[in-house]
Amino acid sequence: MPNQPGPLSDPIHIEQLEISTHIGVPDEERLRLQRLTLGITFWPYHGARDLEDRIENTINYSAVAEAATNFVRDQSVNLIETLADGLATHLLGSFAIQKIEIELRKFALPDAKYASITVTRTASVN
């Protein structure tokens, strides 16, 4: 099954993947682990009808979650915008994904539930 761009397939979604990492602008914020959650929606090159009920014909969402967790934990950035953009680029390059949307939430504001960024990226066609 070659990875050719075409109509978007059926999306796969990972909701509220929880990760702790060092992120933030003030030094005191970066000293302690910050709780983040990720919502990751991705569109494989092949839809559910094409999978023949075989895991090797799709993208294993457990592998995506593990790659996202490892990437976030290995980063040292200040901004959630930078982290979300880097993660989207990393996952597009690591898996046969034609489009990805990531919502990254950070729980750092005392009077708000969270602050978040949503990025949407599409694989480049070579």
Annotated model-derived regions:
Residues M1-N126:
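N-terminal, polar/charged subdomain of small-to-medium soluble alpha/beta proteins
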